[in-house]
């Protein structure tokens, strides 16, 4: 191993080996004085080790050391983190010529000749006699660099006198370094004024008639160029492109320059694209920059057929047209506007966009023109691609001085560079080293100046050119506007690796891994560039921008204190020469340049890993023995690992070559050619550095010992024959596979899988007839069951001779056909003799005809064929007639016959040709003359325009034709035209096969397959009667990495779609429609049969997140195989099997996977056009997936915009693309571990979630400000009195003083036990002012629960009213009655309160049976209030109703937010709340209220004329509430958990078209949706997941419950950082347990779906189902299983308890009848619950079931339980009601009905039904009678129902109150009516 000090001769090598010396002052270093010689040697050795570590780029340094016994070689391992005193010197043998070292430390003896740099200590142990010097040879160090190295030694020795710090913290910059570096980097310069295109405009005035552009396709003067660009810019302005990015895809031409200038003049930014790049890469760039238009030169428009992107072709014709319009608008961009967006290679596999602004480019180009000595006589040969930033310097730099830019054609540029330079008489050119090497000075006599950049320059090229012209080396990156260093005027002996000096401000060199540390002059470090020409940053990538464009490090203060300009980290390694010029040393980490193109090695490695299927890949640029830079991929060779001492590089074997060959195919489609490795090197092992990173330097060194040819030959294709099949049959199958898949025979062996080699279901179908011709009889099912070649052949042999698969007999007997002909003829409008045959329809045909009847024009495919001029049209018509005669399916009509159903009739008739003037006329004709029962289903027309070629039009109904048939039909026409015989085909054979399938077998299959299915329809229908009308479409192209898979594209697409549906519906049991080709049926010739064999099936996929991708695909493929015999059963038959099958067939998404069907381009007719139109489909969403190859799939979505919005579909396609790539690349990954969040999702999430700042204010202080601002304004208007703001402030302050004197300290919790009263806001404010936090208690709660709350709080006192004095005495020993408050008591000094102090606690249901208290701080609540007050229109004029129970946190927002906004709190009494709400609201003149939907349902808008604003919250609402209220008030909806300051989201306006599930956008917080089972994983946009709330409104946690707090208030997930680069990450987020999804509006608003866990809300009150279950299990000790859930029979929300005593495992889950014994038992259980739980937490329904159902993941299937009750009527669920003991004063009804009801009783029954079912009174549905002896609660009523009934009944003259409803029988209520 060698470790040599580098040659630092400043680029001027000399042969001088004489020793020179520099003396160092030893007096500064105490460790070198008064110590022993051995100690001095140790210090010098350590110092020298650190020096070599800094200069040699090596962490294991070696050097010579002289001791008393002579010279030896020593080694020291140096690391950044090791403290210098811990460095250890180890012996490493005798010093000699072969030691590989050239430096040393000596004691003054003889210096060996091999040492070129030595640190010498002369003298004895005495101070005065010691001296220190550094001796060097001039051939190693120049005098300047020697002084720099000596200064570094002094700095290190100085550091060693101090503390024992890590080596990495030693400052190695001596004073000389600081002074020199300061001289190298001067102060910054001002940015030039004006915009980039102003350069050209200035030349128009000065040199208007001089040539600006001289191109292969024309010349333009400056004036002409400006005129054309101005005209085009006006058109671009009219398109609204100002301020946007406009891609330009163009070859070099005058029009490309015109386009660039026009884009700039239009106020837009130009983004050049390379036409030769893969289309997918181009589309990605266009999408990333959000372009609305793309400019192209002729020939490239077809590359950008993208929705929403206009393509503008820049050509003379287009400019002439633009000139005619007269538009000449121009927009002047601002100084900071973007001018160009340039694309570079990105580490993630996607290109990254660099935004260059006008000032930066102008600065760079002005300096470039000056340094390049441009003049008006300069003729610049513009060589580089427009995507290369230097091209901008060439173009605009030349034009800035009035010169001429010469643009060659692509052919000239690449094939005859010398000739092109001569022809254009070019005087200047910027070239890469590779391009310059191909030229000789004698070939280009006019060339005066050459600038070279982009890659290293060879010495021989410098020698050849430096004496013939001005040769300059340039350096720069896209981020520095193309260049920043220039080394002009090279001599023939110049060092070409010297990049020059910074001509614009500064270039700094820092430690390669730490920009905060400068390195000494001469040491290698990373180049940092500072100056006005830096880019703005990376487009849409703040994280990468922050990483590369950094603020000034601390060391900048040593040179320019107060400097604020940014620095760019280049990732290039360089070193200073002693004159300040910079020498290139290599690339840092993953960046490199090859042939002048900057590439990201990490990106290439990513693609190569995917293509090769291995992680062990290193890609680097190798400089070969013959001095050629080769992009090389190093990979582990397959097979057993080799010994560590064996050769590193191996010769490739066949396995390695095969991997490389396959990989190259994939790389060609995913990477530009410049980024594809040209050499693949097999390794025996992957060498690692000491830090366990790939040892790239070792790989480059070893590979660099080879020539370019030797490298390329390592993996050259030299395949040995694959394992030969053993039998003749296997050889036949091998040949068939080879023909079918286009593979060489040698690549197919007996163990190969059909699907692994690229086969799919389509190829399997084609294989069957090919094999039959060779005597191998197999079916498509055989291929799926036995995919390996050897297994498949063996199966064929084992199966023996094939069974009959030819179905020739008509499925309808001949005598029956004759009997049916008259009726068939009548329906078809023909003679009976014209009917050839009649036989049944397949289920597909029946279904398609039925759907067509619902929507005219549906399922009609119109195809157009261009007829070449040489074709005889009459002869073509006859050929079509011949084919139609031979194919009865094209003469088939469908009829419906009485008693026997749909049949198809073959009619003997010729083609009826239509002659039309346009295709639209033909389509319209087929719509008006619909393809219905009895009509022709195949129609032909000719379109023969005068000037264009004739076209043949064919319209055919899908009931007789499918896409598979299209190319088959064309082939038959081709044969007929050529005079060849056309074979007869009969579709009845396929029909006979379908009819022969036993229906009962298929029904049993589907019954089993769909058992217990509980899918969710997606997308949702607006209503049950709605018929989807898909009128819109979107499409995208999926490009996959090349992957060899055993699974078909169909299986992979089905899995991905199932995964997305599961996410978007929140259901792991997924069903969607899937279309099968039907060509797997065992029918002879089915692969060539022309006719509709398609089948649509309900495909059920049960997602198991623990399964791997491969296992899930295997399961899907096996299911598909099992389904094949039953796929023709038809949806209309499957739906009748049972309710579960019916639900499964109600899907609204259909997935179609088909092979590419571009149509054969036949000689007879041109390309077929059969654009898929949305009207072909009848589902809300249809996905058509065209598999165009193993790695390309065209996705097209057809959708109904009323069911799913376009933005949502775009999200789905993006996610499906992302999912396909992952399923393709990581087959071993668990489904749960797949990341389905697409790049588009991340972009939207970043937009929707921005940081919120907390409001640093206390709540009572905000209210006090209102007291100062409007002291006499009414703050409280209550039934028991009114308070102004001044009075409220004064009373609360006095009460606060009393609380403080009674021991309420800062942070104490004070319960408030009050009825609704004006004293409640007084008490709330008083507690806050006293420094405490209030807790509102509901006096209706059980005493046991209230005691539990007070005990948890350790409350020092309870504030109570006189009414609740006794109850309060049971809660605390110390009471304070508000009625006894001393109004004359003096005001005392109160403690300070901080925004971070608690303001209140609110208790919610707890899963352990104990309520849990949520603590909210002042700042949290204040932030939320400020965020929602304005959008909710809560103003000082608002009079807000205080309606909510004190147990509901909405009561807090009713009080506090209102008062903070300066409004008035309108308080009603408890009696008014339940009995006379309308009157109370009117009396208080309330204008604003927060209510739950349950309450609103009981109210009539007309009863509340004063209300102007209504916000619904607390529970889910329905459309009815919106429809009833949106026309009367400003309707809103809010959402928020108690843990997040009451309100977290707000939808500020609800209209009749609003989605009732929409809870709006976040307020005072950010809302993230995460995986429902793992909050560390983001959920894809649009999918259902758990809502996480982040931001200042998040509460402190649960009082005294660390476990529950940590579970719900968790640390912010790591992924939040990617959305907040450079920002502080929030400490915690709150897991709400609510399932939500983003609205399809894609505006960041949320849809509420359900609770994730067992926590729900009922009538606005939050409860934990597990708490109810806990108490119920305690009371029902005999029950083995209990589930409590919220159910909605008839739309009415109730709490139900399901239980089972004897589990019936084999029985379906169903409700059992309630027995008398069970009722008696439950009547004893209910009182036990009522004693422990609030009334809203006690179940109403008690339902015994056969068993508790489980989901596929073995969790309780709550959805299944809810469905048991969902359709029950009140009469049906009445037996399951167990009455409350508080309502038991009346005897329970025995079900006896009065024979005759009074008029009042009939009216009351109708009102009760309306309340219980939500029906309108006019509904005609009969309802069972209700016994007048019943209690309202016994038939499903509750307190809210009582309120609703009271409101309705009052309008009908009844006088009872809500309390009467709960306590009286229905008969007694009926008698309470005014006559």
Curated annotation (Swiss-Prot):
Enzyme Commission number, as recorded: 6.3.2.-
This protein's encoding gene: otaB
Inducing factors: Expression is down-regulated in the presence of fennel, cardamom, chamomile, celery, anise and rosemary essential oils. Expression is positively regulated by the cluster-specific transcription factor otaR1. Expression is also modulated by a second regulator, otaR2, which is adjacent to the biosynthetic gene cluster. Stilbenes such as resveratrol, piceatannol and pterostilbene downregulate the expression of the ochratoxin cluster.
Pfam families given in the database record: AMP-binding, Condensation, PP-binding
PROSITE patterns linked to this entry: AMP_BINDING (PS00455), CARRIER (PS50075)
Pathway noted in the entry: Mycotoxin biosynthesis
Protein name per the record: Nonribosomal peptide synthetase otaB
Ranges for region Adenylation 1: 202-590
Listed InterPro entries: AA_adenyl_dom, ACP-like_sf, AMP-bd_C_sf, AMP-binding_CS, AMP-dep_synth/lig_dom, ANL_N_sf, CAT-like_dom_sf, Condensatn
Modified residues (O-(pantetheine 4'-phosphoryl)serine): 761
Uses, biotech or industry: Stilbenes such as resveratrol, piceatannol and pterostilbene affect the expression of the OTA cluster to reduce ochratoxin A and B production and thus could be used as naturally safe and efficient compounds in food active packaging or preservatives against ochratoxin A in food. Pterostilbene with methoxy groups demonstrated greater inhibitory and antitoxic activity than resveratrol and piceatannol.
Superkingdom classification of source: Eukaryota
Class of enzymatic activity (EC top level): ligase
Region (Condensation): 836-1245
Family the entry assigns: Belongs to the NRP synthetase family.
Reactions mediated catalytically: 7-carboxymellein + L-phenylalanine + ATP = ochratoxin B + ADP + phosphate + H(+)
UniProt-annotated stretches for the region Adenylation 2: 1264-1659
């Amino acid at each position: 191993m060698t470790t040599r000090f580098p040659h630092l001769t400043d680029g001027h090598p000399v042969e001088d080996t004489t020793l020179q010396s520099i003396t160092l002052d030893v007096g500064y270093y105490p460790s070198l004085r008064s110590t022993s010689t051995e100690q001095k040697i140790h210090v010098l050795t350590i110092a020298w080790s650190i020096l070599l570590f800094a200069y040699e780029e090596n962490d294991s340094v070696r050097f010579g050391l002289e001791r008393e016994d002579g010279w030896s070689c020593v080694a020291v391992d140096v690391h950044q983190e090791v403290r210098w005193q811990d460095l250890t010197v180890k012996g490493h043998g005798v010093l000699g010529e072969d030691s590989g070292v050239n430096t040393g430390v000596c004691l003054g003896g003889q210096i060996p000749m091999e040492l070129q740099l030595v640190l010498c200590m002369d003298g004895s142990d005495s101070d005065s006699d010691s001296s220190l010097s550094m001796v060097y040879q001039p051939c190693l160090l120049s005098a300047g660099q020697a002084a720099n190295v000596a200064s570094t030694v002094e700095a290190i020795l100085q550091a060693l006198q101090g503390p024992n710090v890590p080596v990495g913290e030693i400052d190695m910059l001596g004073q000389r370094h600081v002074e020199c570096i300061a001289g190298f980097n001067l102060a910054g310069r001002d940015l030039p004024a004006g915009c980039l295109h102003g350069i050209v405009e200035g030349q128009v005035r000065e040199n208007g008639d001089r040539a600006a552009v001289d191109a292969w396709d024309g010349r333009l003067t400056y004036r002409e160029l400006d005129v054309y660009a101005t005209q085009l810019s006006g058109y671009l302005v009219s398109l609204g492109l100002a301020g946007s990015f406009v891609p330009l895809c163009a070859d070099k031409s005058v029009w490309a320059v015109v386009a660039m200038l026009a884009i700039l003049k239009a106020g837009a930014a130009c983004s050049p694209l390379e036409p030769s790049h893969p289309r997918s890469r181009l589309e990605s760039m266009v999408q990333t920059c959000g372009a609305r238009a793309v400019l192209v030169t002729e020939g490239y428009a077809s590359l950008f057929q993208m929705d929403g992107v206009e393509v503008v072709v820049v050509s003379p014709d287009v400019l002439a047209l633009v000139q005619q319009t007269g538009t000449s608008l121009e927009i002047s961009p601002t100084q900071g506007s973007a001018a160009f967006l340039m694309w570079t290679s990105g580490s993630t596999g996607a290109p990254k966009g660099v935004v260059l602004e006008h000032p930066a480019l102008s600065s760079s180009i002005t300096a470039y023109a000056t340094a390049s000595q441009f003049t008006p006589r300069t003729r610049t040969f513009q060589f580089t691609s427009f995507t290369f930033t230097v091209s901008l310097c060439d173009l605009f730099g030349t034009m800035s001085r009035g010169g001429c830019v010469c643009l060659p054609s692509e052919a000239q540029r690449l094939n005859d560079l010398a000739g092109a330079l001569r022809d254009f008489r070019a005087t200047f050119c910027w070239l890469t080293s590779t391009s310059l090497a191909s030229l000789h000075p004698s070939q280009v006599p006019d060339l005066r100046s050459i600038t070279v950049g982009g890659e290293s320059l060879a010495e021989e090229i410098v020698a050849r050119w430096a004496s013939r012209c001005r040769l300059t080396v340039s350096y720069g990156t896209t981020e520095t506007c193309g260049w920043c260093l220039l080394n002009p005027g090279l001599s023939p002996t110049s060092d070409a690796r010297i990049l020059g000096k910074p001509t614009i401000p500064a270039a700094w060199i820092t430690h390669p891994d730490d920009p905060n540390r400068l390195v000494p002059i001469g040491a290698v470090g990373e180049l940092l560039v500072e100056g006005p020409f830096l880019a703005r940053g990376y487009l849409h990538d703040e994280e990468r921008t922050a990483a590369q464009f950094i603020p000034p490090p601390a060391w900048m203060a040593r040179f320019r204190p107060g400097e604020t300009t940014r620095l760019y980290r280049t990732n290039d390694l360089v070193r200073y020469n002693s004159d300040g010029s910079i020498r290139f040393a290599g690339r840092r980490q993953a960046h490199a340049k090859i042939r002048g193109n900057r590439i990201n090695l990490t990106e290439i490695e990513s693609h190569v890993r995917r293509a090769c299927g291995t992680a062990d890949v290193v890609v680097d640029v190798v400089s070969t023995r013959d001095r050629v830079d080769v992009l090389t991929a190093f990979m582990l060779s397959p097979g057993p690992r080799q010994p560590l001492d064996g050769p590193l590089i191996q010769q490739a074997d066949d396995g390695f070559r095969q991997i490389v060959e396959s990989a190259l195919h994939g790389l060609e489609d995913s990477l530009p050619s410049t980024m594809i490795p040209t050499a693949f090197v097999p390794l025996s092992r992957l060498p690692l550095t000491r830090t366990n990173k790939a040892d790239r330097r070792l790989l480059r060194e070893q590979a660099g010992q080879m020539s370019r040819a030797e490298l390329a030959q390592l993996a050259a294709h030299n395949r040995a024959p694959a394992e030969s099949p053993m039998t003749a049959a296997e050889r036949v199958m091998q040949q068939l596979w080879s023909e079918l898949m286009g593979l060489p025979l040698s690549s197919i062996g007996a163990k190969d899988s059909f699907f692994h080699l690229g086969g799919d279901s389509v190829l399997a179908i084609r294989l069957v007839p090919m094999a039959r011709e060779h005597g191998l009889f197999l079916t498509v099912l055989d291929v799926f069951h036995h995919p390996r070649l050897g297994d498949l052949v063996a199966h064929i042999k084992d199966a023996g001779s094939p069974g009959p698969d030819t179905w020739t007999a008509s499925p309808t007997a001949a005598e029956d056909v004759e009997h049916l002909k008259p009726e068939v003829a009548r329906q078809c409008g023909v003679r009976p003799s014209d009917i050839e045959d009649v036989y049944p329809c397949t289920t597909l045909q029946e279904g398609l005809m039925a759907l067509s009847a619902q929507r005219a024009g549906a399922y009609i495919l119109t195809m157009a064929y261009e007829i070449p001029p040489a074709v005889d049209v009459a002869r073509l018509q006859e050929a079509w007639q011949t084919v139609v005669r031979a194919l009865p399916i094209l003469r088939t009509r469908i009829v419906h016959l009485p008693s026997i159903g749909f049949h198809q009739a073959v009619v003997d008739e010729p083609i009826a040709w239509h002659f039309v003037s346009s295709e639209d006329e033909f389509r319209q004709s087929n719509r008006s003359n619909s393809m219905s029962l009895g009509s022709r289903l195949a129609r032909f027309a000719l379109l023969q325009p005068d000037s264009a070629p004739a076209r043949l039009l064919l319209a055919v109904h899908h009931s007789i034709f499918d896409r598979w048939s299209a190319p088959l039909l064309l082939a038959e026409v081709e044969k007929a035209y050529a005079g060849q015989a056309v074979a007869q085909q009969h579709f009845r054979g396929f029909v006979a096969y379908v009819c022969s399938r036993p229906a009962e077998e298929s029904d049993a299959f589907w019954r089993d397959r769909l058992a217990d299915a509980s899918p969710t329809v997606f997308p949702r229908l607006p209503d049950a009667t709605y018929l989807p009308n898909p009128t819109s479409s979107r499409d995208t192209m999926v490009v996959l990495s090349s992957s060899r898979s055993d699974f078909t594209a169909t299986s992979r697409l089905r899995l991905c779609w199932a995964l997305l549906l599961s996410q978007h519906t929140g259901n792991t049991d997924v069903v969607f429609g899937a279309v099968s080709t039907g060509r797997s049926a065992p029918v002879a010739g089915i692969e060539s049969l022309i006719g509709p064999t398609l089948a649509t099936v309900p495909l059920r996929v049960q997602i198991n997140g623990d399964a791997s991708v491969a296992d899930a695909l295997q399961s899907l493929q096996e299911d598909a195989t099992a389904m094949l015999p039953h796929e023709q059963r038809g949806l209309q038959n499957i739906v009748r099997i049972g309710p579960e099958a019916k639900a499964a067939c109600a899907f609204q998404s259909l997935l179609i996977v088909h092979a590419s069907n571009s149509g054969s381009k036949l000689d007879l007719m041109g390309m077929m056009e059969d654009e898929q139109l949305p009207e072909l489909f009848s589902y809300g969403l249809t996905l058509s997936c065209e598999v165009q190859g193993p790695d390309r799939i065209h996705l097209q979505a057809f959708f109904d915009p009323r069911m799913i919005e376009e933005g949502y579909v775009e999200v789905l396609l993006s996610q499906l693309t992302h999912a396909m790539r992952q399923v393709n690349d990581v087959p071993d990954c668990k489904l749960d571990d797949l990341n389905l969040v697409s790049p588009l999702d991340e972009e939207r999430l970043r937009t929707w979630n921005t940081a919120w700042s907390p409001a640093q204010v206390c709540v009572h202080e905000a209210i006090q400000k209102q007291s100062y601002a409007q002291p006499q304004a009414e703050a409280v208007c209550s039934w028991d009195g009114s308070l102004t703001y001044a009075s409220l402030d004064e009373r609360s302050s006095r009460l606060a003083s009393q609380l403080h004197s009674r021991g309420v300290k800062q942070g104490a919790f004070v319960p408030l036990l009050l009825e609704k009263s004006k004293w409640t806001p007084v008490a709330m404010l008083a507690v806050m002012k006293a420094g405490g936090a209030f807790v509102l208690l509901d006096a209706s709660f059980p005493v046991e629960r209230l005691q539990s709350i007070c005990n948890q709080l350790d409350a020092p006192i309870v504030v109570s009213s006189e009414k609740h004095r006794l109850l309060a005495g049971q809660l605390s020993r110390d009471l304070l009655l508000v009625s006894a408050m001393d109004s004359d008591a003096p005001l005392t000094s109160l403690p300070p309160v901080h925004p971070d102090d608690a303001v209140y606690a609110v208790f919610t249901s707890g899963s352990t049976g104990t309520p849990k208290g949520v603590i909210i701080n002042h700042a949290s609540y204040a932030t939320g209030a400020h965020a929602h007050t304005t959008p909710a229109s809560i103003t000082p004029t608002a009079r807000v109703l205080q309606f909510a129970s004190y147990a509901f946190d909405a009561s807090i927002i009713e009080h506090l937010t209102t008062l903070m906004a300066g409004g008035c709190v309108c308080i009603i009494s408890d009696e008014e709340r339940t009995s006379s709400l309308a009157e109370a609201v009117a009396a208080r003149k309330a204008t604003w209220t927060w209510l739950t939907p349950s309450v609103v349902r009981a109210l009539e808008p007309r009863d509340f004329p004063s209300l102007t604003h209504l916000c619904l919250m607390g529970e889910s609402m329905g459309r009815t509430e919106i429809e009833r209220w949106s026309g009367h008030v400003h309707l809103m909806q809010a959402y928020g958990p108690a843990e997040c300051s009451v309100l977290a989201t707000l939808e500020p306006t609800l209209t009749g078209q609003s989605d009732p599930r929409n809870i709006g956008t976040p307020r005072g917080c950010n809302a993230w949706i995460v995986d429902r089972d793992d909050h560390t994983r983001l959920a894809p946009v649009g999918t259902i997941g758990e809502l996480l709330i982040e931001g200042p409104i998040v509460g402190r946690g649960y009082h005294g419950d660390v476990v529950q707090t940590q579970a719900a208030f968790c640390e912010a997930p790591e992924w939040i950082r990617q959305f907040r680069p450079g920002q502080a990450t929030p400490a915690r987020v709150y897991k709400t347990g609510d399932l939500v999804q983003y609205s399809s509006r894609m505006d960041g608003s949320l849809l509420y779906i359900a609770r994730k866990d067992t926590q729900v809300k009922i009538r606005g009150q939050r409860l934990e189902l597990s708490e109810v279950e806990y108490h119920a299990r305690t009371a029902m000790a005999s029950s083995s299983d209990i589930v409590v859930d919220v159910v909605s029979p008839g739309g009415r929300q109730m709490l139900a308890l399901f239980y089972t005593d004897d589990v019936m495992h084999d029985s379906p889950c169903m409700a059992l009848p309630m027995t008398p014994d069970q009722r008696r038992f439950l009547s004893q259980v209910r009182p036990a619950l009522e004693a422990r739980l609030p009334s809203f937490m006690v179940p109403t329904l008690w339902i015994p079931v056969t068993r508790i159902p489980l989901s596929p993941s073995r969790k309780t299937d709550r959805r299944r339980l809810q469905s048991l009750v969902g359709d029950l009527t009140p009469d049906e669920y009445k037996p399951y009601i167990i009455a409350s003991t508080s309502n038991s004063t009346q005897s329970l009804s025995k079900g006896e009905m009065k024979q005759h009801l009074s008029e009042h009783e009939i009216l009351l029954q109708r009102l009760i039904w309306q309340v219980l079912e939500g029906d309108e009174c006019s509904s005609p549905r009969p309802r069972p009678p209700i016994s007048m002896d019943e209690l309202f609660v016994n038939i499903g009523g509750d307190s809210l129902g009582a309120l609703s009934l009271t409101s309705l009944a009052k309008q009908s003259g009844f006088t009872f109150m809500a309390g009467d409803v709960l306590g009286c029988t229905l008969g007694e209520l009926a008698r309470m009516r005014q006559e």
